[in-house]
Swiss-Prot record:
SMART domains (UniProt xref): POLIIIAc (SM00481)
Cofactor binding note from Swiss-Prot or TrEMBL: Binds 3 Zn(2+) ions per subunit.
First and last residue of the signal peptide: none
EC number in record: 3.1.3.-
Residues given in the record as Zn(2+) 2 binding sites: 16, 41, 194
Protein family according to the UniProt entry: Belongs to the PHP family.
Protein's recorded name: Probable phosphatase Cthe_0111
Keywords annotated in UniProt: Hydrolase, Metal-binding, Zinc
Annotated positions binding Zn(2+) 3: 74, 102, 132
MF (Gene Ontology): phosphatase activity; zinc ion binding
Gene Ontology, cellular component aspect: cytosol
Pfam families associated with the record: PHP
Protein source organism: Acetivibrio thermocellus (strain ATCC 27405 / DSM 1237 / JCM 9322 / NBRC 103400 / NCIMB 10682 / NRRL B-4536 / VPI 7372) (Clostridium thermocellum)
Record: residues binding Zn(2+) 1: 8, 10, 74, 192
Length: 241
């Protein structure tokens, strides 16, 4: 299984990442990545860009160094009804939207409250995937979350960075992978790179996918064409709203 798409990356705009879009694209090209999503943190994160940054992403070329660039965000879940820190008028302009919990944006509560919030987020028509759902600070009912992803046509992310920065994530990620395989839910894999040298790095995720024997057809990162088709359908759906 070869990955050619990276769905989770951060540029210097996130405030705690260290590379420009141009540097990220150049490194992606060198690493054999054909498409990546810029998913800088939403404005509730300390040091993250304001909304105008996301409104102006259109100035970034669609292709740099032969690599396709998706304009996106990692939106923060900011309440337990599933509210995000990005208003609809901005979300609807983006190609790819991740949503996630961060403890500096929302205080962890109970498994039931976390699960309800994520299920509500998955109902948001602009959200494409739940990022790093294996985070042990925010335990989830894995079966219910995966079922909600299936019902809403959304993705579950496996995050390569989680194995290092979110200690205790590995077993949760493995359970998410197993449940996605069981329910036939598609996954996206993100490097969560905060510097250009990590774009397209999936070593830990590769190992996990091998362990659970994940079918290739459930992994979106193997084909630019799969992503193009998904984004085309998403934009058509949003236009009809």
């Amino acid at each position: 299984m070869k990955f050619v798409v990276d769905t989770h990356t951060h540029t210097i705009a996130s405030g705690h990442a260290y590379s420009t879009v141009q540097e990220m694209a150049k490194e992606a090209s060198a690493n054999g990545i054909e498409m990546f999503a810029i998913t800088d943190h939403g404005p509730a994160m300390k040091g993250a860009p304001y909304l105008y940054h996301f409104g102006n992403l259109r100035v970034i070329p669609e292709v740099l160094y032969g690599v396709r660039i998706l304009k996106g965000v990692e939106a923060n879940i900011i309440d337990y009804s599933g509210g995000l820190d990005m208003p609809e008028e901005y979300l609807r302009r983006l190609d790819f939207v991740l949503a996630s919990f961060h403890d500096i944006c929302i205080e962890p509560k109970t498994l039931e409250e976390h699960t309800e919030a994520v299920i509500n987020v998955l109902k948001n028509p602009y959200v494409d995937a739940i990022a790093h759902p294996g985070n042990p600070q925010f335990p989830l009912d894995i079966e219910k979350v995966v079922r909600a992803a299936k019902e809403n046509g959304k993705f579950i992310e496996l995050n390569n960075h989680s194995f290092v920065t979110r200690k205790g994530s590995e077993e949760n990620c493995k359970e998410f992978a197993r449940e996605c395989k069981k329910q036939g839910v598609r996954i996206v894999c993100g490097s969560d790179s905060h510097i250009s040298f990590e774009v397209g790095r999936f070593d830990r995720v590769y190992k996990l996918l091998e362990e659970v024997d994940m079918p290739c057809e459930l992994v979106m990162n193997t084909s630019v064409e799969k992503f193009d088709e998904y984004i085309k359908r998403k934009k058509e759906r949003i236009r009809r709203k």
